[in-house]
């Protein structure tokens, strides 16, 4: 069904994977990731960004595992209870460590944000987004390099609505722009996503290094403490080697577009004789809305006793498993990060049309991928024509909530299968929970009921009709 959607131009950078085989799969997973179909994609330029401005800082903040080691180091190697003064000094050192780690994280994030803003400005991304909206061509067609075809298409007009708009427009196409421009162009977004992949081996080595560094800062009988987890046959060793973690951070920007900017573009560039000035005009800008982090944790149940664990024996199979896990973990982490951004930014929330409206059955094709849960609330919007200013606008006519246990699980269609995962090895493993478990920020993930192919809502059907839009509210 055609209706007015927000538009997104996604970029990816800083995809961190140490294994070259997994790096190829990670990049492919990003390129093939499907945004919710409740958005229009509005691509400009390369989607995978490379360059020194996107290299992750080498000055990494102290990790939680490192911090916990540092916090405990004064206790290790001591045979006598600490005095009150020693305890106070230790606590002071721990606080200083945490403050320094936090300061480093803030500085790194601020620097990264500045790099992204500079990229938007240097590459004139706002201009490119507007050019795409107006179908800019390399040659003039009639009196312009631009046209309104894409705006008309995404404006989701029927024949009657087009007749209404065109009956009052003084210049062909301007009625469509005045009506749809504020709904469509002003809801154009750019996302920059950075992803860090860490498999079990890498996690183990990082934690082992943390312990070794902590040991160097401690002494027993005047000698540094030598800590090395290699060669142990502990349950810890086996467990850490069978995990896979993904951390996603998405930065959200919005195209600045209002009536003043629209008039500036139309008057100065719509009928211009050369587009070069438009493509570099710094009058068109983006604004930063915020960022969100999401994590996905996957663990492999080897079924092996810790004492029988042999790293070399299953490395090959584990690598193959990681190849299968990585796309799924990417989907989960990206979906969750986008869902968090939607909850923080009302205009960025997805809209979806009602599919069924009848007694005892109100449904819409929106689900877990869009962050919908049993507590979600929606407003119902009706498209209304305002004859005075010759525009269509959306008016709130009702509210709806979600029926318990009837939320559509539409997260894993990116894998080329239905959400029940009958033809997908990894989804089946998660479903039976015997060989692999997957968790996100909210806990262990479960595959939804395959018989539910849409989300069921509840509320009064008065004034409702199929095709009306719903939008999630806070």
What are the roles of these predicted feature ranges?
Residues 1-474:
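Surface-exposed, polar/charged interaction patches used for macromolecular assembly or partner binding
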């Amino acid at each position: 069904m055609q209706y007015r959607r927000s538009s997104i131009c996604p970029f990816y950078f800083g995809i961190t994977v140490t294994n070259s085989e997994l790096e190829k799969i990670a990049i492919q997973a990003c390129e093939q990731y499907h945004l919710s179909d409740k958005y229009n994609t509005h691509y400009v330029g390369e989607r995978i960004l490379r360059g020194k401005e996107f290299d992750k800082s080498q000055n990494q903040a102290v990790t939680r595992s490192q911090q916990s080691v540092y916090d405990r180091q004064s206790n290790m190697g001591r045979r006598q209870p600490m005095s009150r003064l020693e305890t106070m000094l230790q606590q002071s050192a721990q606080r200083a460590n945490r403050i320094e780690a936090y300061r480093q994280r803030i500085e790194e994030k601020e620097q990264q944000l500045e790099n992204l803003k500079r990229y938007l400005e240097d590459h004139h991304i706002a201009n490119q987004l507007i050019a795409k909206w107006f179908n800019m061509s390399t040659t003039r067609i009639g009196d312009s390099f631009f046209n309104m075809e894409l705006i008309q298409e995404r404006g989701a007009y029927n024949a009657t609505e087009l007749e209404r708009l065109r009956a009052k427009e003084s210049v062909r196409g301007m009625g469509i722009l005045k009506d749809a421009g504020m709904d469509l162009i002003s809801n154009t977004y750019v996302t920059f996503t950075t992803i860090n992949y860490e498999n079990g081996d890498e996690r183990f080595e990082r934690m082992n290094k943390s312990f070794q560094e902590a040991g160097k800062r401690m002494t027993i009988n005047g000698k540094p403490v030598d800590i090395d987890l290699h060669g142990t046959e502990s349950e810890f060793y086996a467990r850490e080697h069978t995990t896979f973690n993904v951390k996603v951070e998405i930065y959200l920007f919005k195209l600045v577009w209002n009536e003043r900017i629209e008039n500036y573009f139309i008057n100065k560039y719509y009928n211009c004789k050369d587009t070069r000035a438009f493509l570099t005009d710094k009058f068109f800008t983006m604004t930063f809305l915020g960022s969100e982090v999401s994590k996905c944790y996957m663990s492999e149940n080897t079924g092996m006793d810790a004492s029988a664990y042999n790293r070399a024996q299953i490395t090959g199979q584990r690598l193959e498993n990681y190849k299968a896990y990585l796309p799924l973990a990417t989907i989960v982490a990206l979906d969750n990060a986008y869902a968090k951004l939607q909850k923080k930014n009302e205009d960025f929330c997805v809209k979806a049309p009602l599919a069924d409206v009848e007694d005892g059955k109100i449904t819409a094709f929106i689900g877990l991928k869009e962050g919908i849960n049993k507590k979600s609330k929606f407003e119902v919007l009706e498209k209304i024509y305002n004859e005075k200013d010759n525009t269509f606008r959306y008016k709130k006519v009702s509210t709806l909530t979600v029926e318990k246990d009837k939320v559509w699980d539409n997260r894993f269609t990116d894998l080329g299968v239905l959400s029940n995962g009958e033809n997908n090895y990894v989804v089946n493993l998660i479903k039976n929970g015997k060989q692999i478990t997957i968790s996100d920020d909210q806990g262990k993930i479960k595959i939804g009921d395959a018989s539910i192919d849409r989300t069921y809502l509840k509320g009064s059907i008065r004034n409702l009709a199929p095709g009306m839009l719903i939008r999630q509210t806070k």
